[in-house]
């Protein structure tokens, strides 16, 4: 049965498994794949806090990789944000805490007027596959997309001028997830839902390609045939 909010999550991973304990690279690694049925990642409204003190990843590090160590630095500040009622945090750059980078599980998208803006990739931002897919889908649907730095101040200014239309996140698990509010310090920015939002339009197209109801002209999907074990 096709269900747009349910899927099988597939996660390949690799870990050091050498028979030694020392502060050095291992000479042996184990590769595994785990799967899990999943449903909507965030079941309720997403309200985020812009983090301007703690840092997820710094320039020159490995923030652009899917490394487990990158999550460790995010746990404590995220726990503090959760205790205040926030769903997630939006990380800012490690130097000035001025430019937004990503959220805990998502790449971030800002719609100002009719332009979609997503932070340009650097060595502290993980470049997600869903992010790449949405850039392609948005541009093919005539939506202007900019990959560039975007500051917290620019978002606040757009909100004050009434031209901040949407904020949403993208990721393998979340797909496309609208963000309902952003808090910067003591200022809360509430984003009104759009009837024909870019987020809902792009999510519908992406999920249609994933479940086969929309033809995949990009070669993003592969058919997996049933395998019957002989044992």
Give residue ranges: language-model regions.
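Short, glycine/charge-rich beta-strand/loop segments that flank catalytic centers
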Residues: 2-19
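Helix-start/capping segments and mature chain N-termini
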Residues: 13, 20-231
């Amino acid at each position: 049965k096709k269900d747009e909010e349910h899927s099988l999550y597939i996660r390949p991973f690799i870990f050091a498994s050498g028979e030694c304990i020392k502060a050095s690279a291992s000479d042996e690694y184990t590769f595994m794949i785990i799967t899990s049925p999943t449903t909507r990642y965030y079941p309720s409204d997403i309200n985020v806090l812009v983090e301007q003190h703690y840092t997820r990843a710094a320039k020159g590090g490995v923030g652009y990789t899917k490394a487990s160590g990158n999550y460790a630095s995010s746990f404590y500040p995220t726990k503090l944000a959760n205790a205040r009622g926030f769903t997630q945090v939006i990380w800012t750059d490690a130097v000035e805490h001025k430019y937004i980078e990503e959220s805990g599980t998502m790449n971030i998208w800002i719609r100002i007027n009719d332009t979609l803006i997503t932070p340009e990739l650097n060595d502290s931002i993980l470049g997600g596959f869903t992010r790449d897919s949405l850039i392609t889908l948005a541009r093919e649907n005539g939506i202007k997309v900019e990959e560039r730095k975007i500051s917290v101040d620019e978002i606040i200014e757009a909100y004050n001028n009434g031209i901040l239309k949407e904020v949403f996140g993208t990721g393998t698990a979340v797909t496309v997830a609208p963000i309902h509010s952003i808090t910067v310090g003591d200022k809360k920015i509430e984003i009104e839902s759009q009837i024909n939002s870019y987020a809902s339009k792009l999510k519908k197209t992406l999920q249609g390609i994933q479940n086969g109801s929309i033809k995949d002209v990009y070669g993003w999907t592969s058919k997996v045939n049933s395998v019957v074990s002989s044992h």
